[in-house]
């Protein structure tokens, strides 16, 4: 056989030898101590001989000296060009609306002649010359071919700066690894239209005049359903429809659940086209959510858990367990009679989009620190012995809270309280007072507390007929006690608090803060491309956000915004990803999620906005919240 052809064939069979000798050539050229040939001549030294042996199978093998040379070279240099290959955890599969799948890297596609990743490219702590390798784990990893362990290049963002001079959180001027070389595929848009407002209309009962087909079609058009049934298959609650309409579907759901209950891995969720069905089993109850909106399994499960807590707030856990232990086929609708409006208002808030439920945090009314401390002092000064918790709440936003030193309120419990007072009918606003026994499952699911609720009349100038003000403008004083005989004592405390609020002008301060509303994005960052943002402080379990006006004032626009946040939240909190930032584009808006150990930031801009402008605005929003944290958050609160 011709010697040249044999040489080409051997090169084809063992290409690693070519790479090894090429690297060996580069090494010998750069090292004066190992060879003088590269110094004396301008041309590259000739390739060394390639001794080979033939194996029993006919394949060529490198001589031992050559193999050792290749292994030695691999310890000092990369075996290929600089790479930004990522682990499988950084690869996502995006399903488009037309049904096709696209596997894409969260780091984006890279050009072949991109510069190698150097140590100076890794993002260091703002204001520090050292790389940040502690608080924030890396999201970009460089993998050396042939090595099993990925090598961390550095954090995407520096550590969140603490007290002191505000520093850039996201240094957009430094040379960084660009994770946005390729835009993420857009999140699927909700199938929303102007008829979304009819989502909350009641479905008529099926009558005897054979209107079943029409009612059934109307029921099927609903984008979201909630069912609660007992383990025996008895219907307890449904958001839409009566017993005659939902009974066949309850039977189907019960059959599916029972079929999987015998296995060690019971059914939790499944999908049918764009419809997602999530099941939450809690003791003797099954809670089911059926949704065609853009929500993940975990988000729907959190909503079902809130509905379950609403039931416990009425019955307590021991009472619920006792009812079904005595009679498993009990119809629970009788003990829950009168609470359907609470369940429905809570369910509707999820369908409209609830930022509080999404991020599992509370929103506070923006006030100066000195004003809030003044209100705290009034509550502490007026405190009576039976008081456990004292709160001032404006339209679902916390103004002030006093609590025992070793106790704090669960966000889910406060959500139940706010839903009962501000969302559901029955608690009169405009100066009325109520005495409500309530179980707070996050505090103690086995007993009742007693809640005194009284609304402040901020609009003394209004006529008596106009006292029913908007729920967003209502201010409530909520006093909670474990003593069921403390109504009159708490009423006296309320009178004292109101008197002091008027004397110190705090009442007018609260009214002015409500009328001012949430800040617009342009008030914070003039000329910004942002239309809305949602910021959660993890340490305070609180969030703040910008005004819905002017872009998200309608019900459809607000739901579309929250659906975008749901998609971002699901993406960055997925079990199989360590992504700290996510950028998505859709036909309605560009969106960005940014997650650090200290905060979560979600923001949206117009679909034609620039990505760099979006990221720079997000950085400025984070800096603004850091500067205003004692105004937008209640840090610690008042304790006794």
Curated annotation (Swiss-Prot):
Q: How does it sit in the membrane?
A: Peripheral membrane protein
Where do the coiled-coil regions begin and end? none
Q: Main location per UniProt?
A: membrane
| Listed Polar residues bias regions | 13-32
Protein biosynthesis among keywords: no
Arranged from A to Z, the UniProt key words for this protein are: Autophagy, Endosome, Membrane, Protein transport, Transport, Vacuole
Q: What is this protein called?
A: Vacuolar fusion protein MON1
What family does the entry list? Answer: Belongs to the MON1/SAND family.
Task: Map out region (Disordered) in residue numbers.
Answer: 1-66
Q: Which GO terms describe its cellular component?
A: fungal-type vacuole membrane; Mon1-Ccz1 complex; multivesicular body membrane
**Which GO terms of type biological process are on file?**
autophagy; protein targeting to vacuole; vesicle-mediated transport
Pfam families with a match to the protein in the record: Fuz_longin_1, Fuz_longin_2, Fuz_longin_3
Q: Where in the cell is it found?
A: Endosome, Multivesicular body membrane; Prevacuolar compartment membrane; Vacuole membrane
- Keyword Protein transport listed? The answer is yes
According to its UniProt entry, what is the function of this protein?
In complex with CCZ1, is required for multiple vacuole delivery pathways including the cytoplasm to vacuole transport (Cvt), autophagy, pexophagy and endocytosis. The MON1-CCZ1 complex acts at the fusion of vesicles with the vacuole, through its regulation of the SNARE complex during the coordinated priming and docking stages of fusion, and particularly at the stage of tethering/docking.
Biased composition range(s): Basic and acidic residues: 1-12, 33-44
């Amino acid at each position: 056989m011709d010697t040249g052809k044999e040489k080409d064939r051997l090169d084809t069979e063992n290409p690693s030898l070519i790479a090894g000798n090429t690297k060996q050539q580069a090494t010998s050229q750069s090292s004066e101590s190992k060879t003088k040939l590269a110094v004396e001549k301008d041309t590259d030294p000739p390739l060394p001989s390639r001794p080979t042996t033939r194996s029993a199978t006919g394949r060529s093998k490198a001589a031992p000296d050559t193999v050792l040379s290749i292994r030695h070279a691999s310890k000092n240099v990369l075996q290929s060009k600089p790479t930004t290959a990522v682990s499988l955890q950084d690869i996502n599969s995006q399903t488009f609306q037309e049904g096709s799948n696209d596997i894409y890297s969260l780091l984006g596609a890279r050009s072949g002649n991109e510069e190698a990743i150097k140590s100076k490219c890794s993002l260091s702590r703002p204001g520090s010359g050292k790389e940040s390798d502690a608080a924030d784990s890396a999201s970009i990893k460089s993998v050396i071919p042939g090595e099993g362990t990925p090598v961390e290049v550095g954090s995407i963002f520096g550590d969140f700066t603490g007290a002191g001079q505000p520093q850039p959180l996201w240094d957009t001027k430094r040379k960084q690894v660009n994770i946005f070389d390729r835009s993420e595929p857009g999140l699927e848009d909700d199938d929303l239209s102007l008829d979304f407002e009819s989502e909350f209309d009641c479905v008529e009962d099926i009558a005897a005049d054979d209107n079943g087909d029409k009612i059934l079609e109307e029921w099927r058009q609903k984008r979201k359903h909630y069912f609660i049934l007992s383990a025996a298959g008895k219907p307890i609650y449904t958001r839409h429809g009566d017993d005659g309409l939902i009974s066949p579907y309850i039977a189907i759901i019960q059959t599916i659940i029972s079929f999987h209950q015998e296995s060690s891995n019971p059914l939790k969720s499944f999908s049918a086209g764009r419809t997602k069905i999530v099941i939450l089993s809690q003791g003797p109850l099954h809670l089911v959510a059926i949704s065609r909106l853009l929500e993940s399994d975990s988000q729907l499960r959190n909503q079902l858990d809130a509905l379950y807590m609403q039931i416990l707030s009425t019955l307590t856990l021991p009472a619920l367990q006792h009812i079904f232990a005595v009679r498993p086929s009990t119809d629970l609708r009788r003990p829950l009679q009168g609470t359907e409006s609470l369940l429905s208002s809570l369910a509707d808030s999820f369908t409209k989009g609830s930022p509080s439920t999404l991020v599992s945090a509370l929103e506070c009314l923006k006030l100066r620190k000195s004003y809030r401390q003044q209100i705290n002092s009034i509550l502490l000064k007026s405190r009576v012995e039976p008081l456990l918790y004292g709160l001032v709440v404006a339209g679902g936003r916390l103004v002030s809270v006093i609590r025992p030193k070793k106790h704090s309120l669960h966000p889910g419990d406060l959500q139940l309280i706010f839903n009962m007072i501000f969302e559901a009918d029955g608690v009169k606003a405009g100066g009325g007072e109520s005495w409500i026994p309530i179980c707070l499952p996050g505090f103690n699911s086995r007993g009742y507390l007693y809640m005194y609720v009284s609304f402040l009349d901020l609009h003394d100038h209004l006529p008596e007929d106009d006292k029913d003000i908007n729920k967003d403008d209502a201010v409530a004083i909520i006093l909670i006690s474990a003593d069921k005989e403390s109504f009159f004592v708490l009423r006296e405390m309320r009178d004292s608090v109101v008197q002091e609020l008027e004397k110190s002008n705090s009442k007018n301060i609260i009214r002015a803060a409500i009328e001012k509303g949430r800040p617009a994005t342009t008030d914070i960052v003039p000329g910004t491309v942002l239309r809305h943002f949602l910021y959660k402080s993890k340490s305070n379990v609180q969030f703040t956000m910008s005004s819905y006006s002017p872009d998200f004032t309608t019900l459809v626009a607000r739901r579309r915004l929250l659906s975008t946040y749901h998609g971002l939240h699901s993406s960055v909190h997925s079990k199989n990803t360590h992504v700290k930032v996510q950028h998505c584009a859709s036909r309605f808006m560009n969106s960005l999620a940014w997650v650090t150990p200290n905060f979560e930031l979600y923001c949206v801009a117009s679909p034609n906005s620039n990505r760099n402008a979006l990221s720079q605005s997000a950085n400025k929003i984070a800096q603004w919240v850091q500067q205003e944290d004692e105004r937008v958050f209640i840090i610690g609160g008042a304790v006794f």
